[in-house]
């Protein structure tokens, strides 16, 4: 138990958040339970939430349940969905501990048993092929077999992932160092997808992956994309384990046309194709193709 608590003290739980004040306290405590207790540090960077949500933050801060808190008023220019990556980056970079646990309040954790998962996950971060330990996907991604009960994914999400803070700093320096150092001027090509696109590019370049536990009724982490009262309803159903089997392990499915959000009907192929087309026609889609091409060119350069 002492070793487990010592590892917990080395973790900073970090999140950028907007809204969802009604369920914030409950789900934050759900995350503590999932981890095995309050971690060494909790960092929350707000994106311009309403006063009711900010009041919840301040109460949690006064109670010692949030350790670092950054607020901006709702009228602040960074209250902008396309620039939320600024808050996400800040949440990670101001963390003080050697390990970062990314979480989102609309992402629901649950476990029965698996009490030693955190120290095992921290040990796995020293593997040469592991970028992070995580999950909470909404669709399939390229994946590979790992040790029994686990798989390796080509994706990593800030809905739920554990990584070394030093890895996060290295990723952002490699992928967007000049942009960050110059003060986030204008709009970045990836917009709000900056961090997760950076993770993907880094994993592809360095041949590392996210290690993910295969979900079963005793271990699930679901990204709901739910808000406010509906998020509270979804949480109650989730903790009661209602209809969870249909939402487990979306990354492992062969159906590339489906997005799964617990508590909502699946987003099927027609919408998926529209989303693909919309993404492909954005600067992010174009830039991601350029990045992938540069990675291929870099690997095949005979002078390297």
PLM regions with names:
Residues 108-188, 192, 197-201:
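Conserved catalytic core of nucleotide-sugar-dependent glycosyltransferases
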Residues 1-30:
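N-proximal low-complexity "stem/linker" segments adjacent to membrane-targeting elements
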Residues 8, 95-98, 127:
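Active-site acidic short loop of glycosyltransferases
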Residues 28-32, 53-65, 149, 198-203:
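Short, aromatic/basic amphipathic alpha-helical patches
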Residues 26-40:
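Short, acidic, metal-binding catalytic loop of nucleotide-sugar glycosyltransferases
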Residues 174-304:
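C-terminal catalytic/acceptor-binding lobe
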Residues 44-96:
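Active-site-proximal specificity loops/subdomain of glycosyltransferases
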Residues 97-108:
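Short beta-strand-to-loop acidic/aromatic patch adjacent to the donor-nucleotide binding site
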């Amino acid at each position: 138990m002492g070793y487990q608590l010592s590892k917990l003290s080395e973790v900073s739980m970090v999140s950028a958040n907007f809204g969802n004040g009604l369920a914030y306290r409950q789900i934050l405590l759900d995350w503590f339970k999932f981890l095995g207790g309050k971690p060494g540090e909790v960092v929350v960077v707000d994106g311009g939430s309403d006063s009711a949500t900010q009041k919840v933050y301040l109460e949690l801060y006064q109670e010692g349940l949030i350790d670092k808190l950054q607020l901006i008023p709702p009228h602040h220019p960074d209250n902008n969905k396309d620039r939320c990556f600024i808050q996400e980056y800040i949440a990670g970079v101001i963390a003080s501990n050697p390990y970062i646990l990314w979480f989102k309040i609309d992402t629901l954790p649950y476990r029965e048993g698996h009490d030693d998962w955190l120290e095992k996950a921290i040990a796995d971060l020293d593997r040469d092929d592991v970028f992070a330990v995580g999950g909470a996907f909404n669709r399939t991604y390229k994946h590979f077999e790992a040790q029994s009960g686990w798989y390796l994914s080509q994706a990593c999400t800030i809905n739920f992932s554990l990584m070394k803070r030093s890895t996060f700093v290295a990723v952002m320096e490699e992928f967007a160092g000049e942009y960050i150092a110059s003060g986030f001027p204008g709009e970045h090509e990836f917009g709000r997808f900056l961090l997760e696109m950076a993770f993907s590019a880094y994993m592809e370049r360095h041949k590392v992956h996210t290690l993910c536990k295969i979900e079963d009724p005793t271990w699930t982490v679901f990204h709901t994309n739910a808000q406010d009262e509906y998020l509270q309803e979804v949480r109650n159903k989730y903790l009661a384990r209602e209809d969870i089997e249909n939402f487990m392990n979306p990354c492992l499915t062969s159906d590339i046309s489906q997005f799964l959000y617990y508590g909502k009907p699946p987003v099927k192929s027609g919408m998926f194709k529209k989303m693909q087309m919309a993404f492909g026609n954005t600067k992010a889609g174009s830039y991601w193709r350029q990045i992938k091409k540069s990675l291929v060119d870099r690997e095949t350069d005979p002078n390297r």
